Structure formats: C-alpha cells, structure tokens
C-alpha cells in the first residue's frame, strides 16, 4: 500500500523535451580555443601524440576551427620568434605554432593565430607596446607559417581594452 511508489507518478509522455530549439536543430559549435598558456599547463605536459589525439576528438565532434588564444605572454612564447628572442623572451622547447598548424592541416581545420601579450599593458595601461610588438610578430609569423600552411586562417586579436586604455 503505497510503499515503493513515487508520488506523483511520471508517465513516459511527460518526459518530452521542452527545449525552445528542437533537439539537433541548434547552432553547432565548430570552433574552439587552444589555451596555450605558454608558462603553464597543458602544453608543457603534452607532447604531439596527446595533441594529435585531442585534434582527433575535436574533429570527431565537428570542430573545424582552432584559435590559439595568444602566442606568448611576457617572456614565454609558443614559437621561436627572432624578434621576441632579441627582446629577452625565452626560446620555447617546442614550436607549438608549427605543431598546431600541422595538426590543423592533418584534420582539415583552420588555425587562427592569437597575438603576443608582453604584459606591459597590464602593468602600465598603455596598449602601444602591444601594438608595436605585434606589428613585428605578425610579419614574421606570416613569413614563417602563413605562406607555408593552408591551414593558417588568420589572426586572433586577444588584447583586452577598456575606456581607460592608453595608446
């Protein structure tokens, strides 16, 4: 008598979706960010095999665009930049940009290059340092990779600004 029964009873018909957009009819997510964080995880803990597997999984779920959030932060960078090395940045142990572009090409994806962040804007509020550095970064990256890989899709401007931004 009433034991073991849930009240009120739910019938199969009551479990229909109440979604505004019908299932499998919404906008698909086809792009994602590669969070290089060049002085932290994941890239220092992952080799090319792990990245390849990640790209395989992304491709399998419909990702066709990968965007590297930034190409470097302060003295850490994702590729061997002649310009940034002269400015005191550290030589990376792996050329992540080349690896990402090769994997993007292998899985028929487009890769977008996130610009360099010197950290000076965060220290001073003056954006002109970032603009000047990235003029050189863009030119050298295009020569090193843009002309070489069909997967190179363009640029991602990763800088953050506010009404108080100078420069």
Residue ranges and their predicted role:
Residues 1-3:
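N-terminal Sec signal peptide cleavage junction
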Residues 7-64, 69-72:
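Boundary/entry segment of secreted carbohydrate-active catalytic domains
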Residues 25-30, 62-64, 107-111, 149-153:
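Short, well-ordered coil/turn segments that N-cap beta-strands
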Residues 33-36, 70, 113-117, 156-159:
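A cross-domain feature marking catalytic cores of carbohydrate-active enzymes
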Residues 35-48, 80-92, 122-132, 158-166:
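The substrate-binding groove and active-site-proximal loops of carbohydrate-active enzymes
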Residues 48-60, 64-118, 167:
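Aromatic-lined substrate-binding rim segments of carbohydrate-active enzymes
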Residues 97, 131-142:
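Acidic, His- and aromatic-enriched active-site or binding-groove loops in soluble protein domains
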Residues 116-122, 138-166:
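Active-site groove signature of glycoside hydrolases
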């Amino acid at each position: 008598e009433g034991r073991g029964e849930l009240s009120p009873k739910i019938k199969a018909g009551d479990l229909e979706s109440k979604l505004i957009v019908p299932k499998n009819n919404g906008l698909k997510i086809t792009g994602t960010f590669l969070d290089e964080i060049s002085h932290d995880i994941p890239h220092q803990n992952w080799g090319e095999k792990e990245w390849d597997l990640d790209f395989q999984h992304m491709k399998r779920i419909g990702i066709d665009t990968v965007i590297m959030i930034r190409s470097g932060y302060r003295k850490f960078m994702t590729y061997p930049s002649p310009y940034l090395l002269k400015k005191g940045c550290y030589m990376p142990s792996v050329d992540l940009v080349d690896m990402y572009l090769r994997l993007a090409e292998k899985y028929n994806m487009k890769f977008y290059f996130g610009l360099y962040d010197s950290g000076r804007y965060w220290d001073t509020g003056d954006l002109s340092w970032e603009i000047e550095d990235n003029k050189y970064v863009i030119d050298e990256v295009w020569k090193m990779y843009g002309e070489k890989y069909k997967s190179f899709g363009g640029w991602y401007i990763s800088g953050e600004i506010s009404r108080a931004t100078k420069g």
